[in-house]
Amino acid sequence: MAKVRKAPAGDFIKFLGTAGARFVMIEQLRASGGIWIAFAGTNVLVDPGPGSIVRCAASRPRLDPGKLDAIILTHRHLDHANDINVMIEGMTEGGFKKRGVVFCPGDAICDDSVILRHAAALPERIEILEANKRYIVKDFTFETSMRHIHPAETYGLKFSIGGTSVSLISDTKYFLELSSFYKADILILPVVFFEPRPGVDHLCLDDARNIIRQIRPKKAILTHFGMTMLKSKPHIQAQGLTRELGIEVVAASDGMTVGF
């Protein structure tokens, strides 16, 4: 079973931020730096939002962007992609080493690209994410989900890391097929709203409850909190879900590390 650690050591998932929705991000009530995954010497950064480079520098021990092997964007929205260019600079050691891979949906590098032309030339390659495809990053693989229901082209991720499966749901409106794809040992869910918000393509706490109940992972981690979730105290809500579902549910905090 996964365990929470205070600092990275060996193989881990580290939350460089847990902000969801624009006002939590803008006011930095929670950090918005994305998620760093490390396994067997391979390092991947998912969704480097605003302040990702700062959160790497502030981590203890410090996370070195020059050790990254890949950066993945689940979609182009600012809370997920704002720091993509500076993190590409970091991964390539200021552009002096052509290394690393960037994975992103096609609309992230369209005419209104979130990746600057200069930065796009720095990594070894940019791979376009498509629905239900498998990708390899050195020592582990990941799959993309079906396209999510969200204004931007958005895909979630399922990682096979050693003997552990980790699913990361990205922003989406709830739909039934989510539970069939995201079955995993560790399930990470973005819970923007405390209560349903019709017409807005994000998950609420009831959606998270339904998904966790259907998948029954060994551990579920709530993150990407909006204002209503913060006011409702995510750790209290996670404790309630643990009691209700009989599954370990944790509310992520900025800097939290989960070891394998």
PLM features: what roles do these ranges have?
Residues A2-R60, E153-S170, I186:
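Conserved beta-strand hairpin/beta-sheet module of binuclear metal-dependent hydrolase folds
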Residues Y174-G259:
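Cap/insert and terminal regions of metallo-dependent hydrolase folds
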Residues P50-G51, A108, H148-P151, S170-F175:
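Short beta->alpha connector loops
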Residues G51-V101, A184-I186:
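Active-site metal-binding motif and surrounding structural segment of the metallo-beta-lactamase
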Residues N82-M91, V114-I115, L230-Q239:
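Metal-dependent catalytic neighborhoods of phosphoester/phosphodiester hydrolases
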Residues L45-G49, L68-D79, C104-P105, V166-T172, ...:
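Active-site neighborhood of phospho(di)ester-bond hydrolases with catalytic His/Asp-centered motifs
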Residues A2-K6, K97-T154, I161-G162, G255:
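Metallo-beta-lactamase
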